Amino acid sequence: MESVRQQKVARLILKEMADIFLKESRVLFGNVFISITVVRMSPDLSVAKLYLSIMLQEDKNAILKEIKVHTKELRKLLGERIRKQVRIIPEIIFYLDDNVDYANHMDDVLSKITIPKKEDENFDPNQYPGLKE
């Protein structure tokens, strides 16, 4: 469980990095929409793990690699914004958050399931024992 301080610093980093990605991503990464879904801080506040959701792009891993190339530059921009609020600027580690893709996949799977209605002539109550009358 994260401490209150970890949560505060994580929220601060999320807010500032989201603003940095909003303003700088077009210059650095082209026409890609990058959002930060979660920030996790280490107990000593020296490492921030940022989970990114990358949209409008097919090859998300290529964009993630490009982001990792610019990690120093992004950390410098973050440091300029939060240096008076934290003692040390944390090391930034980026991860790809695939929860949105997984949710879309599960939505597709669930939409393909067809359960006949009780009024349907093909309905067999023995085939669906969990359904109540």
From Swiss-Prot:
Any one of the GO BP annotations: maturation of SSU-rRNA
Molecular function terms from GO: ribosomal small subunit binding
Pfam families xref list: RBFA (PF02033)
Gene3D superfamilies on file: 3.30.300.20
Cellular-component GO terms for this entry: cytosol
Assembly and oligomerization: Monomer. Binds 30S ribosomal subunits, but not 50S ribosomal subunits or 70S ribosomes.
Subcellular location: Cytoplasm
Record keywords, A-Z: Cytoplasm, Ribosome biogenesis
Name by which UniProt lists this protein: Ribosome-binding factor A
Native species: Cytophaga hutchinsonii (strain ATCC 33406 / DSM 1761 / CIP 103989 / NBRC 15051 / NCIMB 9469 / D465)
Superkingdom of origin organism: Bacteria
Gene name of the encoded protein: rbfA
Family note: Belongs to the RbfA family.
Function per UniProt: One of several proteins that assist in the late maturation steps of the functional core of the 30S ribosomal subunit. Associates with free 30S ribosomal subunits (but not with 30S subunits that are part of 70S ribosomes or polysomes). Required for efficient processing of 16S rRNA. May interact with the 5'-terminal helix region of 16S rRNA.
